[in-house]
Amino acid sequence: MTAGRGDEDSLAAGGPARHIPVLRDEILELAAPQADGLYLDATFGAGGYSRGLLATQGARVLAIDRDPGAIAAGAGLIAESNGRLTLVEARFSDLAAVAERLGLGAFDAALFDIGVSSMQLDEAARGFSFRFDGPLDMRMQQSGPSAADIVNDADEEALADILYYFGEERASRRIAKAIVMDRAKAPFRSTAALAAMIARVCPGKPGDIHPATRSFQALRIAVNDELGELVAGLAGAEARLKPGGRLAVVTFHSLEDRIVKLFFAGRSGRGEAPSRRLPGEPIPPPPTFAVSGRQPVTPSAAEIAANPRARSAKLRHGVRTSAPARAPGRDLMALAALPQRAAKGR
């Protein structure tokens, strides 16, 4: 999608949304679009990757995005594509069902660009950003609980867990306690009010990221179940890729990258136990992906200079084998969900 995926301080460095796809050349080189190929752009956004794929005459693209605004903005590219682009409002977890409903065959490549986009962050009314005053919303689709619902209704322990596990916020307990105390006087309704409270409780040092960065990331991930959707999307792509098809995933923070890294390690056999096994020990399933080359791929110095918002991007990729797809393991599901009990000592 666009250049603005990642932590919001990286996004602020780039200014207003410029709709520049991150690692575009590397992604398209991996996808290697062909005239008779079918490709998945799982995060349409401003259409940067889809446009690159469609530049190959005869290539067809299924693009999905859970943001209705992105779908509406894609009407022009649909018209330009002469029927080669199908754009659907859907989540990652809907991917396989959408492809099945449309009667599509297996994909030659599947491309993911994970996280919130610069367009979403730069629109104050969406409530994603601490840089603008807007409603405390953060929903990519206008359904389900908002960030305000979580902040005003969740108990202190649940809030601390969300901030700690989804934002890697060390001051999670302090911030959660302050939220509960302040909301007793008046509920939080705006991004500015929440950001100001966090800055008051955890004032940063000059040169540090904004004190609210990690908390806003955590709330956004919780509101949209971003990590659970990522796991579902990886599994859906595995099920719909043809042998030899490529899966390429760009992430912008450590939680996402950890899931993608673990997925490829487990699916390629790199995460399995040594070849010598005890009698009766189960044989691991055959690899569903082949992974090669130095990974992750990161933006060049020239790309970062031209587009500072790209600086935290990491690209991991693999080639689909003919082995049957399988359900995500418990290790992946555990990374995508909050632990049942809060971690102690934080």
From Swiss-Prot:
The GO terms describing molecular function are: rRNA (cytosine-N4-)-methyltransferase activity
Query: Which parts of the chain are coiled coil?
Result: none
Q: Where is the composition biased (Basic and acidic residues)?
A: 270-279
Q: Which Pfam families does the protein's record reference?
A: Methyltransf_5
Q: Does the keyword Transit peptide apply?
A: no
Chain residues that bind S-adenosyl-L-methionine: 47-49, 65, 92, 113, 120
Cellular location(s): Cytoplasm
Q: What Enzyme Commission number(s) does the record list for this chain?
A: 2.1.1.199
One cellular component GO annotation, for this chain's record?
Answer: cytoplasm
Record's keyword annotation contains Transmembrane helix = no
Catalysed reactions, semicolon-separated: cytidine(1402) in 16S rRNA + S-adenosyl-L-methionine = N(4)-methylcytidine(1402) in 16S rRNA + S-adenosyl-L-homocysteine + H(+)
The alphabetized UniProt keywords are: Cytoplasm, Methyltransferase, rRNA processing, S-adenosyl-L-methionine, Transferase
Q: Where is this region: Disordered?
A: 270-346
Q: Which top class of enzyme applies to this chain?
A: transferase
Query: Which BP terms does GO give this entry?
Result: rRNA base methylation
Q: Which Gene3D superfamilies match?
A: Putative methyltransferase TM0872, insert domain, Vaccinia Virus protein VP39
Q: Which SUPFAM superfamilies match?
A: Putative methyltransferase TM0872, insert domain (SSF81799), S-adenosyl-L-methionine-dependent methyltransferases (SSF53335)
Relate the protein's function as given in its record: Specifically methylates the N4 position of cytidine in position 1402 (C1402) of 16S rRNA.
The family annotation for this protein states: Belongs to the methyltransferase superfamily. RsmH family.
Q: What is this protein called?
A: Ribosomal RNA small subunit methyltransferase H
Q: Which gene encodes it?
A: rsmH
